[in-house]
């Protein structure tokens, strides 16, 4: 199974693609979709949708796993929620089934504790994907953790 993990954001959307078809997890790609904060949010949303569309066409994921947020009060809440909506819409448009996980569930699935530290989750990502170096940037590593959670929780 090919899984696309997504760490939503407006300035940076992390993505990670894993393949599990050979009985073990393998990283195929990871990175970020970066938008320019100096341009209109609507244009940034179009860029996110366009880049995500390219990723879907290239990797043909059978499942997308997306981090689910629980916001309190934050000045970036609305824009991140809007970007997340664009991501969900793009996945639906290409008929990619989607699952969502809150951060605590991702930490629990990877590190065994919903209160695990970021480095514990990163160590688990490296171990599960047999990586010698940590994936960079952090948003891409987070997206790989989300993709792995999608595989573990299927």
Curated annotation (Swiss-Prot):
One Pfam family linked to the record: RuvC
Q: What is its main location?
A: cytoplasm
Name the coenzymes or cofactors required: Mg(2+)
Give the EC number(s) listed in the UniProt record.
3.1.21.10
Gene Ontology MF: a single term: crossover junction DNA endonuclease activity
Task: Write down how the cofactor binds this protein.
Answer: Binds 2 Mg(2+) ion per subunit.
The residues that hold Mg(2+) 2 are: 67
| Keywords (A to Z) from UniProt | Cytoplasm, DNA damage, DNA recombination, DNA repair, DNA-binding, Endonuclease, Hydrolase, Magnesium, Metal-binding, Nuclease
Catalysed reactions, as listed in the record: Endonucleolytic cleavage at a junction such as a reciprocal single-stranded crossover between two homologous DNA duplexes (Holliday junction)
Q: Where is the active site?
A: 7, 67, 139
Quote the SUPFAM superfamilies the UniProt record gives. Answer: Ribonuclease H-like
Give the top-level enzyme category. Answer: hydrolase
List the GO cellular component terms: cytoplasm; Holliday junction resolvase complex
Q: Which CDD domains does the record associate with it?
A: RuvC
What are the binding positions for Mg(2+) 1 in this chain?
7, 139
**Role, per record:** The RuvA-RuvB-RuvC complex processes Holliday junction (HJ) DNA during genetic recombination and DNA repair. Endonuclease that resolves HJ intermediates. Cleaves cruciform DNA by making single-stranded nicks across the HJ at symmetrical positions within the homologous arms, yielding a 5'-phosphate and a 3'-hydroxyl group; requires a central core of homology in the junction. The consensus cleavage sequence is 5'-(A/T)TT(C/G)-3'. Cleavage occurs on the 3'-side of the TT dinucleotide at the point of strand exchange.
Tell me which family the UniProt entry assigns to this protein: Belongs to the RuvC family.
Quaternary state and partners of this protein? Answer: Homodimer which binds Holliday junction (HJ) DNA. The HJ becomes 2-fold symmetrical on binding to RuvC with unstacked arms; it has a different conformation from HJ DNA in complex with RuvA. In the full resolvosome a probable DNA-RuvA(4)-RuvB(12)-RuvC(2) complex forms which resolves the HJ.
Query: What is the name of this protein?
Result: Crossover junction endodeoxyribonuclease RuvC
Upper classification of the organism? Bacteria, Bacillati, Cyanobacteriota, Cyanophyceae, Synechococcales
Q: Which gene encodes it?
A: ruvC
């Amino acid at each position: 199974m090919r899984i696309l993990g997504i760490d939503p954001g407006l300035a940076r959307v992390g993505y990670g693609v894993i393949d599990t078809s050979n009985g073990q997890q393998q990283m195929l790609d990871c990175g970020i979709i970066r938008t320019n904060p100096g341009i209109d949010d609507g244009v940034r949303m179009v860029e996110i949708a366009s880049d995500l569309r390219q990723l879907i066409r290239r990797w043909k994921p059978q499942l997308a796993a997306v981090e689910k947020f629980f916001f309190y009060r934050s000045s970036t809440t609305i824009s991140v929620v809007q970007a997340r909506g664009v991501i969900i819409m793009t996945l639906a448009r290409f008929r990619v089934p989607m699952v969502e996980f809150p951060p605590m569930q991702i930490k629990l699935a990877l590190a065994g504790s919903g209160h695990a530290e970021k480095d514990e989750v990163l160590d688990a990502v490296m171990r599960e994907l047999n990586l010698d170096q940590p994936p960079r940037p952090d948003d891409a590593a987070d997206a790989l953790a989300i993709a792995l959670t999608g595989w573990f929780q299927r």
